[in-house]
């Protein structure tokens, strides 16, 4: 897969070495008509005031507004366009808001505390998941009595099917927010936990994945946390570093299978496609790597499913429930690419994330499905330098810096791309387009950091209009619960969707092919060429919203 991405990027780098200006854009009538068309659409926009049968939330981990914009440019350039004018799938969603991402104890949050906010409706502390702010990081005994419930849990309680699909490990902080209660977000398996919290009764995240609630679809990475220590990995049987890690000797996959009729476990793309299309399958677990799934450019399309594949498979299985479903999908490797200071990895992941959103939009009706796209936090990622229209998103600014050397449009505020030699290194256009290139950073840190900026929320479907203005991040969970008439909003007073009894007929499964093709859309325009150097959420929710029932 990496070769295909490289060829595409080389192609548009050569094509876009000169800035191009569409001649029609020089005419004011072009922009007047464009605005008039958008205005006509806006005037006809009517909120869908029914309840939502289905609930989908797409989480772009670390996908701040700058990342969204850069992804839009990359997508457009991969399609042969100039870039910024090309819409993303999420751009077509009619409602938008901003989300305040701070956690209770941190101005700049992490993926754990934010997941608790947008999935459980309660803000909490740094590195804790599924617990209130009364719990303390790394203090096991503060977990009990401070657990909070997710919207997914409430959807399951209401009779819906539920699922998670992720491009990281399924025990990662973001998907874990749908099912776990932990004061330490990296307790992936029991081997990752100290002795004391185990003695005090705290459970690792993998154990809670199969025991806290009844999840119909689980797709992502994280195999090694599910099997006894030393168990050979099916994909890498001779690699001792990829064997199972569980010290309690449990086979959690087998335990999960034994609980459910109609359940299947898969570990590669072909099996995923086959089982998801089997109408007898109502429970599907797919774990495709020992830890995190591969970056999109490194993915083997014959062995490893894309996030779009996982989304489509999940929707096939979940849609078999006439009462509807709840689905969480995360583009988790966007975040990892940014932490590495490697924008190429982050943005190519974001392009695939957007394709998963597009696939879900084709499979799920806007009339009965509330779909939300958002991010947990942003990153110290930016792009600038007055680059000319059509310049590769990975390219150089048109003018050199004060030291006489070129610099990339994309830069990081901190990260591993800092070079402390006393002299900023030169960077060439070829280097800046290398998939492994780490953009220069102002401050040296081992892993680039998140930021405290607001992030965008995109929404469509029933009650999507409630996502407006600037909101606290936990408001997202309350909108989803209200739209689905789930606790604590079971008396929502909303009529059912008009087509609630319509059988779900997903589009033809696009993952049945074993080769990957890229469709290129070319927009023909007349151009001129320029030379280029290269909080309205409830103040207090009912008690049932906040606390997990003791067992």
UniProtKB/Swiss-Prot annotation:
PANTHER family assigned to the protein according to its UniProt record, in alphabetical order: ALKALINE PHOSPHATASE, INTESTINAL-TYPE ALKALINE PHOSPHATASE
Biased composition (Polar residues): 528-537
Catalytic activity entry: a phosphate monoester + H2O = an alcohol + phosphate
SUPFAM superfamilies for the chain: Alkaline phosphatase-like
Extent of Low complexity compositional bias: 511-527
UniProt-recorded name of the protein: Intestinal-type alkaline phosphatase 2
Origin species: Rattus norvegicus
Active site: 111
Signal peptide stretch: 1-19
Binding site for Ca(2+): 235, 288-289, 304
Similarity section: Belongs to the alkaline phosphatase family.
Cofactor names: Mg(2+); Zn(2+); Ca(2+)
Role according to the record: Alkaline phosphatase that can hydrolyze various phosphate compounds.
Positions of GPI-anchor amidated asparagine lipidation: 531
Assembly with partners or alone: Homodimer.
Amino acids binding Mg(2+): 61, 174, 330
Note: In most mammals there are four different isozymes: placental (ALPP), germ cell (ALPG), intestinal (ALPI) and tissue non-specific (liver/bone/kidney) (ALPL/TNAP). Rat has two genes for the intestinal isozyme.
